[in-house]
């Protein structure tokens, strides 16, 4: 789903600091 992909991408960006 697009929401799932966006959620994963958002989490990945947040961990990048």
From Swiss-Prot:
PTM sites of type Threonine amide: 17
Main location: secreted
UniProt GO MF annotations: toxin activity
Keyword Secreted appears in the UniProt entry: yes
Superkingdom field: Eukaryota
Tissue specificity: Expressed by the venom gland.
Transmembrane domains' residue ranges: none
GO CC list: extracellular region
Disulfide bonds: none
UniProt family annotation: Belongs to the cationic peptide 04 (cupiennin) family. 07 subfamily.
The name this protein goes by in its record: Cupiennin-7b
Originating species: Cupiennius salei
